[in-house]
């Protein structure tokens, strides 16, 4: 299961302001608390990584992640393929990239339907579609105006493979994802639309970037001394006193917009949606 290698922005923002926000977790003002059932706690040899799962984007893959996590399947598995500025891959009990669980493979969830209550905030309007953030996930989507001419009053959207994004690895078939997943440490547009996005690292991206890297000549294969997931749990399965609490800035809020403008100022003409990391509190 190796990874192979229109409306104006202002008008869209005005439309979005009229919709309710259906977020993953409790929301208070500018901040949203990630629900414990959607907070994936991955302890590694290099530290802790917290991933927000996004069921609105890939419900079947989220169900698989939860099932395997609750079984203890991921505990002790190595990050067998790590390529700097690209991704770190794990989830194979064989540690080779060819293994998986005994559960059946999953049908790809490369796109999803987005409603006006999704809480999407546009950030970039270049090329085809609006690019912005929903929850903590970077996505590209059709504008809200398209919802008025669809039977379900929704529009199509697709997750983007930016730094921190969690995706499912697969073999050649688009419907062959099983247990392996990867955490992005860089941007790779070639994966967009061909692999399932299911979440994003909201804390610990520095930990992912510190994992032992593989040999470039061996396509990132790390070998027997690879770093491992010592334990993977859902926050909801942890004793309440031990649960990490993460609050993410709501897309379109003041702290979110400040982060966008800071990234835009730093990157200048090269700015794109992958430069935006939603601000986070807690841990």
Regions found by a protein language model. Give the residues of each.
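Bacterial N-terminal signal peptides that target proteins for export
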Residues: 1-9
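Bacterial N-terminal signal peptides
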Residues: 8-17
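Cyclophilin-like peptidyl-prolyl cis-trans isomerases
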Residues: 3, 19-283
